[in-house]
C-alpha cells in the first residue's frame, strides 16, 4: 500500500512515512477550530477581569498575612498537643455521643414527617393550585437558607439550651432539603398509574396514597437515609452553641485548652461520621 493510496488509514505504515510507530498528526481533530481574534480578546479580558476581581475580594477580606505565614507552625504545634489523645476520657464521651446520634435521628424523623405535606404542595402535579405551590416552595427556601447553627441559636432562645433545641434545629434545616427531593420524586412519577386510579373515581388523597406513594417510596427512603447521614455530621457541632451532644464536650475541652482531650473527641467524631456514612451507603445500595 503506497502513501498515496486513498484507503490508507491514519497511523498505518503507509500513512506515516516518517516512522515512529504512533502515526503522524496532520492537524487538529474534526470539530476543533481556532478562536477568532475577537474571541481571543474577549477571553483574555474576561480572565483578567476575574483575576482582578478575585484579588480585590481577597484584599477586602482583611487577611493577616503574617498569621497565614505562621499557620503551618501553629498547625504543627496544635497537632503535637492533641496527640496522643487522652484515651482515658473515652468513657465520658459515650453519653454525649449517644445524645448526638439521637438528635440527628429524631431531627431527621421530624423533618421527614413535615416534609411530606410540603413536598405534596411543592410538586406541580400534586399541588392544588398556584398559591399552595408557592407556599410549598417558600417553605423549602426558608428552611434551606438558614444554617443549622443559626436555627439552633434561635431555638435555644425559645426552648433553652439542650438536646431539644438541637432536634428542632436539625429538623427545620432538613425540611427544605428533604421536601425538595421528595417533590422532585413526585414530579417524575409515571402518570399512567395516576390516571388509572383516578378513573375509578378516587379522591385526590386516595390518588396520592394508592398511585403516587408506591412509586416514590424508594426515593423517600433513599433521601431520608442520606439526610440522616448528613445530620449525624451536623449534630456533632451543635453543642458548640449549647444545643447538646458531643459538640458541647468539644467546646468545653477547647475552652479549657485540654488539647489531648480535643484530639480524642475529634477521633471519636471522625469514627462516628465514617460509620454513619458506611451504614447510609449500605442501606441506599439495598434500596436501589
Annotate each predicted stretch with a short phrase.
Residues 1-109, 116-117, 121, 125, ...:
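N-terminal, non-cleaved signal-anchor transmembrane helix
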Residues 94-102, 136-143, 147, 229, ...:
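Alpha-helical membrane-interface segments at transmembrane helix boundaries
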Amino acid at each position: 500500500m503506497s502513501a498515496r493510496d486513498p484507503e490508507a488509514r491514519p497511523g498505518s505504515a503507509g500513512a506515516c512515512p516518517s516512522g515512529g510507530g504512533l502515526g503522524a498528526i496532520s492537524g487538529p481533530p474534526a470539530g476543533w477550530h481556532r478562536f477568532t481574534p475577537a474571541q481571543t480578546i474577549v477571553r483574555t479580558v474576561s480572565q483578567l477581569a476575574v483575576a482582578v476581581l478575585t484579588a480585590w475580594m481577597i484584599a477586602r477580606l482583611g487577611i493577616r498575612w503574617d498569621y497565614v505565614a505562621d499557620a503551618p507552625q501553629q498547625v504543627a504545634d496544635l497537632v503535637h498537643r492533641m496527640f496522643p489523645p487522652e484515651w482515658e476520657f473515652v468513657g465520658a464521651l459515650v453519653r454525649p455521643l449517644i445524645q448526638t446520634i439521637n438528635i440527628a435521628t429524631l431531627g431527621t424523623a421530624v423533618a421527614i414527617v413535615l416534609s411530606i405535606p410540603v413536598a405534596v404542595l411543592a410538586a406541580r402535579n400534586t399541588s392544588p393550585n398556584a398559591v399552595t405551590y408557592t407556599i410549598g416552595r417558600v417553605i423549602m427556601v426558608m428552611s434551606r437558607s438558614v444554617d443549622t447553627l443559626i436555627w439552633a441559636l434561635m431555638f435555644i432562645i425559645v426552648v433553652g439550651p439542650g438536646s431539644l433545641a438541637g432536634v428542632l434545629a436539625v429538623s427545620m434545616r432538613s425540611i427544605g432539603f428533604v421536601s425538595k427531593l421528595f417533590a422532585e420524586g413526585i414530579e417524575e412519577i409515571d402518570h399512567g398509574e395516576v390516571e388509572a386510579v383516578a378513573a375509578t373515581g378516587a379522591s385526590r388523597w386516595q390518588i396520592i396514597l394508592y398511585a403516587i406513594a408506591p412509586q416514590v417510596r424508594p426515593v423517600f427512603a433513599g433521601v431520608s437515609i442520606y439526610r440522616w447521614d448528613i445530620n449525624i455530621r451536623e449534630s456533632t457541632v451543635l453543642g458548640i452553641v449549647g444545643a447538646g451532644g458531643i459538640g458541647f464536650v468539644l467546646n468545653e475541652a477547647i475552652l479549657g485548652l485540654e488539647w489531648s482531650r480535643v484530639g480524642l473527641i475529634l477521633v471519636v467524631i471522625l469514627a462516628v461520621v465514617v460509620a454513619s456514612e458506611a451504614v447510609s451507603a449500605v442501606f441506599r445500595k439495598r434500596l436501589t
